Design a protein with these regions (language model features):
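N-terminal hydrophobic/helix-forming segments and targeting peptides
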Residues: 1-210
Length: 210
């Protein structure tokens, strides 16, 4: 990425910026139609939004809500938090790639907007706990919640570090399908966000069944 700030030379540039300064894409939160939103950093603001609501539920057993950092540059935060907490189970909340746009067909879509939460059995960094995976889909069926799985082994998230911490941690990821992931104009459907939250809310209560 080359950024032209209009400086004439090095000395001129140093008046405005320093080595190591951070930059970001300017992007405004926008509503698209009746139930879609566009914003930067929906991965992982979507996960944060779900967690904030889950915190208000006051879980019946000891639950740690961790807002990890630096996932995109090495799963650093999740590695430290998983080592510190050593949980019995972990649920990763995030957004994941939806390529359901013109010119993309079949399995290459990975997942689609409007089809609910994405519960993966596997991605590039994790093989998820099969009992958690099955429980998630059982709950979705019982509560009539739309739910899908990825049609390709693609992407990864904090689960990649969490599930291999210590003696291993039983882990599942529940994701909101998101177009244009990692861009300044991510797009999701609010129904998918709400249905993902409802799924995780029930899942977190029923984990002791496993």
């Amino acid at each position: 990425l080359y950024i032209d700030i209009g400086a004439e030379n090095k000395e001129d540039a140093e008046k405005y910026v320093n080595l190591g300064d951070c930059v970001y894409f300017e992007s405004e939160f926008t509503e698209l139609g009746e139930n879609r939103i566009k914003s930067k950093a929906i991965d992982d603001r979507a996960g944060c939004a779900m967690m904030i609501n889950l915190i208000r539920e006051e879980p019946e057993y000891d639950t740690y809500f961790v807002f990890n950092v630096q996932e995109e540059i090495g799963l650093r935060g999740s590695r430290v938090s998983a080592f510190s907490v050593q949980p019995d189970f972990a649920i990763v909340l995030e957004a994941t790639t939806a390529s359901d746009i013109d010119g993309v067909s079949g399995a290459k879509k990975v997942c689609e907007l409007g089809k609910g939460a994405v519960v993966s059995f596997m991605d590039r960094s994790t093989v998820y706990d099969k009992e958690l995976y099955r429980l998630a889909f059982d709950i979705a069926k019982e509560e009539n919640l739309p739910c899908q799985t990825k049609t390709m082994i693609a992407g990864g998230n904090d689960a990649g570090a969490i599930h291999i911490t210590g003696n291993g941690i039983r882990t599942l990821a529940v994701s909101v399908p998101c177009r244009y992931l990692h861009s300044a104009s991510c797009v999701i459907e609010t129904d998918d966000l709400e249905n993902s939250y409802r799924l995780v809310k029930t899942l977190s209560k029923r984990i002791p069944e496993i």
